[in-house]
C-alpha cells in the first residue's frame, strides 16, 4: 500500500483528489498512463456510493492534414473509445454531449458531433446502428434542453467517411 506522501506525489492520484475537492473539473492524463490506472485512481476517491453519472474518457486527436482536406482545425474529440464496452443509449448520448461541451469550451467555437456507426441514416439495418440512432436523437434533445442548439450540432447515426466529408454523404 502507498503512504500518503506517495499517493500525493503520484500525479493521477493528486489530480483525482483535486476533482474530489472541487479544485478541478476533469483530469488530463495524456498517454503516459494506462487508462485503467487513471480510472482506478478516480474510483478510489469518488464519493458517490451509487454513481449518478458514468465515468468516461475523452481522447483529443490532432490531425493537421485533415484541416486542408476536410476544413476546420483538424482537432477531433473522441468520446469514450476504451472505457465502457457496452454503453447504454443514455450513456452514449451523455458522453457525446459532455464531450461536445468540453470541445466547445476548449476550442472557443461551435462544434459538430458525429455519432459514428456502420450505417448512415439507416443504410444498414442492425441493432448497433439503431442504438446509435437512438443515442443521437437523445443527445439532440439534451442539447436542445440545455439551449445549446447554436453551439452544438449532432449528426447520426453516420459513417466516418460521411462525417468527415459532405461529399461522401448523400441520403
Please give the residue ranges for each predicted region.
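Anion-binding alpha/beta catalytic cores of soluble intermediary-metabolism enzymes, centered on
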Residues: 1-171
